[in-house]
Design a protein with these regions (language model features):
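Charged DNA-binding/catalytic regions of mobile-element recombinases
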Residues: 1-136
């Protein structure tokens, strides 16, 4: 999860990326950093992809990802959960790097008035530019 600044407070971006293709498989923007936010993102990923049998989903050890609810959802989908070592973001470097690129290339160019404006802008960046035009 990464923080997106708006004039009304933070928005929280949850992202699932394919580490092989570097494409964003699913994302969601929330007004709160909750288990429900990361569950919605995972459900979007499942609906958008034909995924192989042996899927490993890697995340940090944030409370959203270590919650019983999230672990049960992963188990329901038959996924293996892999964690970064606590306080060691390098294990999740590809996603951390992508969040940095998103912010430098796009988010910091704007001053979002509200959540909806941030959502529309990030939607355009991911769906119309990053996944379809930007070289990975």
């Amino acid at each position: 999860i990464t923080y997106i600044p708006t004039q009304q407070g933070w928005a929280y971006l949850s992202t699932i990326m394919d580490r092989y293709t570097k494409k964003v498989i699913a994302w969601d923007l929330g007004k709160r950093m909750t288990v429900e936010l990361v569950q919605r993102t995972l459900n979007k990923a499942i609906k958008s992809q034909d995924y192989p049998e042996a899927v490993i989903l890697h995340s940090d050890q944030g409370s959203q990802y270590t919650s019983l609810e999230y672990e049960e959802l992963l188990k329901y989908y038959g996924m293996t959960h892999s964690f970064s070592r606590r306080g060691y973001p390098y294990h999740n470097a590809s996603l951390e790097s992508w969040h940095g690129h998103l912010k430098r290339e796009w988010v910091y160019q704007f001053k979002y008035k509200n959540f909806e404006e941030a959502y529309q802008s990030i939607f355009w960046y991911i769906e119309a530019f990053y996944n379809s035009k930007r070289i990975h």
